[in-house]
């Protein structure tokens, strides 16, 4: 399939929205619950970035130059950070430290990538938005660390809502554009 970038973007949206829904409705999460939820979010986001890299590698019409492998790089960092969070984060401050560092580094990387390609590539603006939201979520988690796991997950979950909705809109737009470009977006012609 020529135009298949919508699938990894949709995967990221689903991961973010599932995480957001759980964090909103789980009223008193324990530290163990919090670390596993954050691990799910980080690993899921990383897998979607690696999936995006696989799809980008198949497309000859996408030229990101030397920046071509950046989604894979921050995807691997997300996955490793999520695994480390699940295994090591046995206190609130350690959970916040790990998640804030991972989200901060990946968010800055995604923001820079988005700024570089915001006019040239359809995902450029989405990368910029996701990068900014992720960096602010990392900073917010640091600010509410003393308030406990619910507050930390609340900040990350709030960011996940923004990420999920924006990525869902982006995925649907990419899907629509892909179908229009392939000529399959139209239904059967009606004869009067």
Language model features by range: what are they?
Residues 11-16, 38-51, 69-83, 101, ...:
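Core segments of alpha-helical transmembrane spans in multipass integral membrane proteins
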């Amino acid at each position: 399939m020529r135009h298949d970038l919508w699938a990894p973007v949709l995967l990221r949206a689903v991961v973010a929205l599932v995480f957001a829904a759980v964090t909103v409705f789980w009223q008193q999460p324990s530290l163990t619950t919090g670390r596993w939820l954050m691990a799910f979010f980080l690993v899921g986001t990383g897998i979607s970035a690696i999936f995006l890299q696989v799809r980008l590698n198949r497309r000859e019409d996408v030229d990101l130059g030397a920046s071509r492998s950046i989604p894979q790089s921050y995807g691997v960092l997300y996955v490793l950070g999520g695994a480390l969070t699940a295994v090591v984060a046995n206190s609130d401050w350690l959970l916040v430290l790990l998640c804030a560092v991972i989200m901060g580094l990946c968010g800055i990387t995604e923001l820079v990538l988005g700024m570089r390609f915001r006019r040239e590539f359809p995902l450029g603006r989405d990368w910029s938005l996701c990068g900014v939201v992720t960096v602010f979520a990392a900073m917010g988690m640091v600010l509410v660390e003393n308030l406990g796991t619910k507050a930390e997950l609340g900040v990350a979950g709030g960011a996940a809502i923004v990420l999920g909705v924006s990525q869902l809109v982006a995925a649907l737009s990419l899907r629509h554009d892909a179908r229009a470009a392939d000529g399959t977006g139209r239904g059967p012609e009606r004869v009067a």
